Swiss-Prot record:
Disulfide bonds: none annotated. This is Dystrobrevin alpha. The lineage of its organism: Eukaryota, Metazoa, Chordata, Craniata, Vertebrata. Residues 1-288 are annotated as: Interaction with MAGEE1. Keywords: Cardiomyopathy, Cell membrane, Coiled coil, Cytoplasm, Membrane, Metal-binding, Phosphoprotein, Synapse, Zinc, Zinc-finger.
Amino acid sequence: MIEDSGKRGNTMAERRQLFAEMRAQDLDRIRLSTYRTACKLRFVQKKCNLHLVDIWNVIEALRENALNNLDPNTELNVSRLEAVLSTIFYQLNKRMPTTHQIHVEQSISLLLNFLLAAFDPEGHGKISVFAVKMALATLCGGKIMDKLRYIFSMISDSSGVMVYGRYDQFLREVLKLPTAVFEGPSFGYTEQSARSCFSQQKKVTLNGFLDTLMSDPPPQCLVWLPLLHRLANVENVFHPVECSYCHSESMMGFRYRCQQCHNYQLCQDCFWRGHAGGSHSNQHQMKEYTSWKSPAKKLTNALSKSLSCASSREPLHPMFPDQPEKPLNLAHIVDTWPPRPVTSMNDTLFSHSVPSSGSPFITRSSPPKDSEVEQNKLLARAAPAFLKGKGIQYSLNVADRLADEHVLIGLYVNMLRNNPSCMLESSNRLDEEHRLIARYAARLAAESSSSQPPQQRSAPDISFTIDANKQQRQLIAELENKNREILQEIQRLRLEHEQASQPTPEKAQQNPTLLAELRLLRQRKDELEQRMSALQESRRELMVQLEGLMKLLKTQGAGSPRSSPSHTISRPIPMPIRSASACSTPTHTPQDSLTGVGGDVQEAFAQSSRRNLRNDLLVAADSITNTMSSLVKELNSEVGSETESNVDSEFARTQFEDLVPSPTSEKAFLAQIHARKPGYIHSGATTSTMRGDMVTEDADPYVQPEDENYENDSVRQLENELQMEEYLKQKLQDEAYQVSLQG
């Protein structure tokens, strides 16, 4: 009693230690229950060193402990279960190099306590054989397809069809593993678990079983099982990508990419714990990546796949025959090693992977000849005398096995190896044994020298042809799958390119580079608006000058042609300059730009207040250009008073025909222009008055050459101003177009 209580106390302490170490990993913070369950079971698997054991090692250990012959419902005590686990881990240490030896006793103790906690929570000290097989097959390492094939061999009948009762029992036992790591509310067993996976009206074979459990997504109750194997496969996968949340320079394991946010990628720890930054949300769809490919490699693969005209998508598993292969007849194997127990029906169903054509221990399929039957009978009758005194118990079953020469020769070799002195016992027996060997050798020589029948010669050729055709069909299927995957990859790359070339506002807000570019564009827009305002102010000043010139023309048309220029407008025409106030007020209406301009020009350039600034500026530029063109033509075409009608008709084609009359005489107009020369502007009032008094009819011959030069200068100046206005108009149109595009 004291020893039992001590063992029970040690067991509970080791269980608590295992679960305490699991809690120290902070796995409960994982947001998704599927990943949380898979991570916990992966921790138990690595802690117990079961990830170093594959399904084949488990099957071998079960056979060595004769569990394959037991009924699945048979219960094992703790000592028997500990013996099975000892076989597994001691054999593992033999396979491991000396530098990677494991602590066998600790692994056995941890795994034993975990199995007892999962399958014997009441503490009865017994676990069924079926539960042990399912637990070891689920938690061991290796490929998931091999595990599922072994599990199917345990829950199917002899015809290769799944039994629903056994599958329900399998779910009942295997779902105790998530419950043992405190994930029972998410993946506990329910009555509807089996019905949610398969329909009872449909026969489920091995291929259908593998298709369902290896599909994406798998059944809800077993969704953690494929994820457990994916975790093991990607533990050491390196991704040279920066995490968008924790900003780590690289990732290990899974990599997750958001399907809505541009270039938003998370490492597995940030994704599992629900971290999100910026505009990314946990509700966004994420894609899981188990490997990393550089852009160059992606392009190379896409091109190679597109050129191969086939799809790279491989099937989930190879196709297996619906009917299981018959087990090998082990009765005719030369058993020179220690005999092993014959496999049961359920274990022999797992022989799907055993190639029947490659085994050297297969019985002949052709019926024996009459002479061979008689010879075998003679050998069987001679067997008791042959085995007498050799330490072998003779019975009818042994006699049946001795019906083949291979077994007889094997026994003879063992006898000579174990007891060489038996050759001296009896000369009769030696002669009899030599005759048997000679007869067997002669028959083998005759069979090797004789030619094979045509059917037997063609059998290898037929099998080779069948294998070649099967390989060709598999290759065609693989190429077709690769072609489909290439097309999907090309479509995905095209969509990504289109999305990258047309960034959405949401993506622009998330990218700092795009935000900086947007700020620069807005700053450029403000500068252009200020430039536009300055140009508008300059244009207003030009229009003021034009108004003064038109008033001058009206005054000369109404007054005397010989009047003195001193009575005209004496202030100089201001040149267009960039106003400092215009830069300080970047936006104002077109009506404000016409302030201080006469009514004639305002009527010509007035626009509706509903139009935008760009249209107002374009209309004003056109009007000024037409007016300046008309004025230049007016100055060039005046040759006397008789040209007054031609000037009036020229101005009639413009919008200012009622405002700009022609001067009465060329000399009066020249006198007006002469009075506005810079030399007279900069002179004092006295000089201006004297020059005005001196301008008479008698002085015209002396003033006329200078007036003609100044007239030519004025014409050239107006032409230059016209060209400047054309240039400003074109530049204003270009800048307004750029502002409209950037806005």
